[in-house]
Regions:
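Glycine-rich beta-strand-to-loop/alpha-helix junction loops that act as flexible
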Residues: 1, 28-33
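Conserved alpha/beta-domain cores
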Residues: 1-22
Length: 141
């Protein structure tokens, strides 16, 4: 799922409903961005599992994610780094891989940071099922 168009969402919802009607599990391949997890949840699409290399690819191309925010292309656009740092502070994101400006120079740190952002997004979506107020707060970020 590289692009979540309305048609993609309708198709995924229909596939999920059909799979569940037969007692099957529902896996989605290729979640490209952690924000997609929230969008899927908002559409009533809750896969049993998913996979992604988006965190790896984005980091390799100089982009970093925050759990529920846009991606930032920090290696080529100085303003994007500033926006990322502001969004990071606003969202209280803190991981050992993005503590300083080395993130702009180290592909491995970006990749690992993006993996943490995906894991945090999954946790927010999972907590949202148990704590709707937390989920709604996360959606408003």
């Amino acid at each position: 799922v590289n692009l979540l168009s309305q048609n993609s969402l309708k198709l995924l919802k229909a596939l999920q409903d059909e799979a569940l009607s037969f007692g099957m599990k529902f896996h989605i391949f290729g979640i490209g961005n952690p924000t997609y997890l929230v969008r899927l949840k908002n559409e009533g699409i809750e896969p049993t599992s998913f996979d992604s290399t988006g965190w790896w690819k984005a980091g390799g191309f100089g982009k970093v994610f925050l759990p529920l925010s846009q991606q930032f292309h920090i290696t080529r656009k100085p303003l994007a780094l500033s926006r990322f740092l502001n969004a990071k502070a606003k969202n209280s994101h803190d991981c050992p891989f993005c503590l300083d400006s080395v993130l702009t120079k180290s592909r491995w740190l970006r990749v690992l940071h993006n993996l943490v952002a995906f894991a945090e997004a999954v946790q927010i979506v999972m907590d949202g099922a148990q704590k709707p107020d937390l989920f709604l707060k996360a959606l408003r970020r």
